[in-house]
Amino acid sequence: MSQIHPTALISPSATIDKTATIGPYCIVGDEVTIGAHTVLHRHVVVTRLTRIGEYNQFYQFSSIGEDPQDLKYAGERTWLEIGDHNTIREACSLHRGTEQDGGLTKIGNHNLLMVNTHVAHDCLIGDHNVLANNVGVAGHVTIGNHIIVGGNSGIHQFCTIDDYSLVGGATLVLKDVAAFTMVSGNPAKAHGLNIEGMRRKGWSKDSIDVLRQAYRVVFRSGLTTVQALEVLKQDLLPKESKIEFLIDSLQKSRRGVVR
């Protein structure tokens, strides 16, 4: 049987796994699903229409699955999905999607959202990411995998933050952040590769050296994006398969990448 504190308020339409824990003064609303071994510590509100996986931790004063802050929203049935092994610290706000963009906000697995992080409607967040204190993620943003976003940073609507990148503290991101890059400033500018992140993943020196070459081609050579892509594909991709991540970033970007 689930461990539910007597002061918690649970909707009859909520589904809570028998191994989950619902702490004091939590509220679990309509059509909420909470998976195995997930813990709502205390004073957590899961408003409605939210699916939460296994082994997640939610800390006090978090607001989960609230209506989107979008003037077009008119009460449609939209959803928030949260995967497994995530830690959501104090006072985070995670909003559901809007009908105009698929009706879903989605957070993957093994993410750490630190104090007062906001994830707006229709965002898609992958796996193994860290969003530090007071990060604001506007609507329709895509954040990939293995990314760190420094505290007090803001990410503009519709931007993409690609895999293995690093956003420095107090950064304003107005364009897409290419894979592997390190950006900071207001507005954000590229300041090299996320070398320390690569080393922590155990990547070889040879792989990192090829990625350094790729960075210089794209960001420091003066070539157009089309010209840089040709060099990456013809000269560097045969040497290192991870170059494909950078190629993909450049090809799919609609806002242009931070340079």
From Swiss-Prot:
Record-listed E.C. numbers: 2.3.1.129
Recorded GO CC terms: cytoplasm; membrane
SUPFAM superfamilies: Trimeric LpxA-like enzymes
Catalytically driven reaction(s): a (3R)-hydroxyacyl-[ACP] + UDP-N-acetyl-alpha-D-glucosamine = a UDP-3-O-[(3R)-3-hydroxyacyl]-N-acetyl-alpha-D-glucosamine + holo-[ACP]
Disulfide bonds, paired cysteine numbers: none
Keyword Cytoplasm: yes
Subunit structure of this chain's protein: Homotrimer.
Class of enzymatic activity (EC top level): transferase
UniProt keywords, alphabetically: Acyltransferase, Cytoplasm, Lipid A biosynthesis, Lipid biosynthesis, Lipid metabolism, Repeat, Transferase
One example of a Gene Ontology biological process annotation: lipid A biosynthetic process
Role of this protein: Involved in the biosynthesis of lipid A, a phosphorylated glycolipid that anchors the lipopolysaccharide to the outer membrane of the cell.
UniProt-recorded name of the protein: Acyl-[acyl-carrier-protein]--UDP-N-acetylglucosamine O-acyltransferase
Compartment list: Cytoplasm
Sequence similarity: Belongs to the transferase hexapeptide repeat family. LpxA subfamily.
Keyword Lipid metabolism recorded: yes
HAMAP family recorded: LpxA (MF_00387)
